[in-house]
Amino acid sequence: MDDNEMPEKAVPGEACGLNAGLDTAPGAEVAEVLEGRAAFYEMLASLFFKPLTQDQVDAMAVQDFSPYQGINDAFDEGINHVTRYLRKRHTGTRQELACDFTSAFAGTKTYEGKSAVPYESVFNSEEGLLCQGSYHEVYAAYKQASLHKREGLDFPEDHLSFLCQFMAVMSRRAMNKLDADDVEGAVEDLRCSREFLGRHILSWYPAFEERALLIVGTRFYRGVLAMARGFFAFDAEVLDGLVEELAGE
C-alpha cells in the first residue's frame, strides 16, 4: 500500500488479523496491538464498502473470532449474529447479503424517508445531506496526513469505510515509527487517531446504527453493526492505554 493513498478495501478473512490481538494487558507487544487494530479496521472498511463476494463470504464463515470474545457485550453480540448466520449459509447467501447491503448502505431503501448511507455528514448535519461541515473536516485531516482516495472512487471522503481506512493507516504509521525508535512521532499519530475516532466515528455511529437497524433484514448485518459499535468503543480504550503507556500520561 502506498502510504499517501487511501486503499480501497481489505478482504475479510484474509487481512483482518484476528490473531494479532488487541490485548493491552501487561506483556502485550505494542506492535502487535497496533497491527491488530489496523487489520480489524481494514476488515470493517471492507464490510461497509460494497457487497461481499462469494470468496469473502466463505472466508468470513471459517474465520476464528475466538481471540476477541469478551471484548465487550456489543462486540460479542455482533460476533454471535455473524457466525450464526454464516453457519447456515447456502447457495443464495451471497445474493441475500448483497440485496441487504444495497438496501441499507447504498440507500435504495429508506425508513420514514431516511436512508442509512454511512456518511458522517448525513448524520452530523442538521440538513442530513452529503458533503457538509464534517466532510470538510475529514478531507482536511486526510490532507494533513498526506492521504487521498484511490482514483476512480466517487464516494465522498467521510464514508465510514474511508474513516476506518484512515484509522488503519495511522495505526501502521505509529507502528513504523516505533520500529524506528520515534516514540514521540508514534504518540502523535495515536493522539491524532484518538481525536479522529471520537470526533469523526463515535460522534455519529450510534445514530447511523440505529437507523440502519430499521432497514437491514439479515442477522449478518445486524451483527456487523453491533460488532463495529463494540470495536469502536473498545478501541477508544485501547488508544487511551497506548498513549498512557508510551507518553506516560
What is the predicted role of each segment?
Residues D2-E249:
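Surface/interface-facing alpha-helical segments and adjacent flexible terminal/loop regions used
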